[in-house]
Structures are given as C-alpha cells and as structure tokens.
C-alpha cells in the first residue's frame, strides 16, 4: 500500500438540510453547499436519504446527481424503496447503513454476517445497475469477511467508537482495531473508507492508516462553518487530511 496516496474527503451535507428542515424553508440550499464544498477541495459529496426524510429529501438527491462535478455517495438503508430510488437516480456510489427511526445519528455498523443473503442481494442489484457499493461496518474481522462474501467492493469502517473514546487508552485500543480492520480488508481486496464522528481534532491518526482511501465527514465541518464559513471549513479539513497523510 502506497502511504503517499491522497485521501479523498467526502463532505456529508446532511446537516445543511437539517437546518433547512427545522423551519421547512427553501434555504439553506443543499446544492449550493455542495458546490461550495467542491470549490474548497472536496472529492465527493455524501448525503443520507433516511426513510423518515428528517433532513435530506428525494429532490436533493436528484439535484445533486444532476449538478455536482465530483462523486455523489448516497447513504441508504437496505430496503426495496431505497434500492429503487438509487437505481433511478444512479449515484456514483451507495453506502448501505443500518437505520433506526429513533436514533439521532447512525449508531453502529451493519450486521452483514447476520443478514448476508439480504445484503448480498442488495449489493448485486446495485452493482448490476453500475453503482459502486460500500457497506458501513464496525471494525470487526467477521463483518469484513462477510462484506467480501456479500460482494461489496468497498467497506466504510465505523469510526464512532474511536471518536467517542473517553481517554487516551480507550482511543488507542479503538485505533488499533481500525488499523487491523483495514489490513484485513486490504488482504481481501476491499477498498477501505471510514467515517463517523470524525473531527478536526481526532482525524489525524485515522489519516495515517495507509489503506484508507476516503473519509466521510459532515457534522464537524458544518459546525465549524457557522464561524468560519463553509468554504474555509472544508478547505481546512482537506489541508488537515493531506498534512496528516503526508507529514
């Protein structure tokens, strides 16, 4: 693995839509946010079309697919409705995630090993439509091996436990799990992405895992944008990723 390979930043713009949906106004524009993120160096745009439509709406996905210049990564649950939407809109990539209506945000990885047939069938349907499929999973070898059996070419490692670690010892343990998981995935021929809970303060160590190709980050960027502006917030994260990988 070439440690000099740059990391692609996928900017998750869900929380731009969260602000809009709080008042059900036409602003702020998700599409405008995506344009600004691209201008600042984002390598892709990520959006989660949840079953309850709490933030991103169907029309947002359609507009993003029609107009952005980079990659659209659609996060979605493993349901027939979402597969049909993905096959109609045809994003560059789909990341399959677990989903519960009562959760504030995605709380854990997919149980691929426990639902191998259903997830495998979804991977086949999306793959047959020419859509790259990734599976959002915890950094557990059994889940990574199941992802390979399901036919997904990409995994996204759930970094939430690392991000939520209460002290340096816990953080070190979770970081080692991520490093080992990335090595297991590489040995199985899988592309490794990662995300969830990553911030400007904790992303550096993740960048130094050489197998990681893409990081999807949203909340921290949108939060910083309140004070510095979205373009600067994205540019700061792009610079941080490159410095951590190459420095």
UniProtKB/Swiss-Prot annotation:
Family statement drawn from the similarity comment of this UniProt entry: Belongs to the PNP synthase family.
Function of the protein: Catalyzes the complicated ring closure reaction between the two acyclic compounds 1-deoxy-D-xylulose-5-phosphate (DXP) and 3-amino-2-oxopropyl phosphate (1-amino-acetone-3-phosphate or AAP) to form pyridoxine 5'-phosphate (PNP) and inorganic phosphate.
Keywords: Cytoplasm, Pyridoxine biosynthesis, Transferase
Active site residues per record: 48, 75, 196
GO molecular function: pyridoxine 5'-phosphate synthase activity
Binding site for 1-deoxy-D-xylulose 5-phosphate: 14-15, 50, 55, 105
Catalyzed chemical reaction(s): 3-amino-2-oxopropyl phosphate + 1-deoxy-D-xylulose 5-phosphate = pyridoxine 5'-phosphate + phosphate + 2 H2O + H(+)
Biochemical pathway: Cofactor biosynthesis; pyridoxine 5'-phosphate biosynthesis; pyridoxine 5'-phosphate from D-erythrose 4-phosphate: step 5/5
UniProt protein name: Pyridoxine 5'-phosphate synthase
Lineage of producing organism: Bacteria, Pseudomonadati, Pseudomonadota, Gammaproteobacteria, Methylococcales
Primary enzyme class: transferase
Protein's UniProt keywords contain Transferase: yes
GO-annotated biological processes: pyridoxine biosynthetic process
Organism domain of life: Bacteria
EC code(s) of this entry: 2.6.99.2
Residues marked Transition state stabilizer (site): 156
NCBIfam families per the UniProt record, alphabetical: pdxJ, PRK05265.1-1, PRK05265.1-2, PRK05265.1-3, PRK05265.1-5
InterPro entries, A to Z: Aldolase_TIM (IPR013785), PyrdxlP_synth_PdxJ (IPR004569), Pyridoxine-5'_phos_synth (IPR036130)
């Amino acid at each position: 693995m070439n440690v000099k390979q740059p990391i692609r930043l996928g900017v998750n713009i869900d929380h731009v839509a969260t602000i809009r949906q709080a008042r059900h106004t036409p602003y702020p524009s998700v599409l405008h946010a995506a344009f600004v993120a691209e201008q600042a160096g984002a390598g892709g745009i990520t959006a989660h079309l949840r079953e309850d439509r709490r933030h991103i709406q169907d029309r947002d996905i359609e507009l993003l697919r029609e107009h952005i210049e980079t990659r659209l990564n659609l996060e979605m649950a493993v349901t027939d409705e979402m597969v049909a939407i993905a096959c109609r809109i045809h994003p560059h990539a789909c990341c399959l995630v677990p989903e519960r209506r009562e959760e504030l945000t995605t709380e854990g990885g997919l149980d691929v090993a426990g639902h191998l047939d259903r997830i495998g069938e979804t991977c086949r349907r999306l793959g047959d439509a020419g859509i790259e499929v990734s599976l959002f999973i915890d950094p557990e070898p059994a889940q990574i091996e199941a992802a390979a059996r399901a036919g997904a070419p990409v995994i996204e490692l759930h970094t939430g436990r690392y991000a939520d670690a209460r002290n340096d010892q816990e953080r070190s343990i979770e970081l080692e799990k991520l490093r080992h998981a990335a090595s297991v995935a590489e040995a199985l021929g899988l592309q490794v992405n990662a995300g969830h809970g990553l911030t400007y303060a904790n992303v550096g160590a993740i960048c130094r895992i050489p197998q990681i190709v893409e990081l999807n980050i949203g909340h921290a960027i949108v939060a910083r944008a309140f004070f510095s502006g979205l373009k600067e917030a994205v540019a700061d994260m792009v610079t941080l990723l490159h410095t951590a990988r190459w420095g």
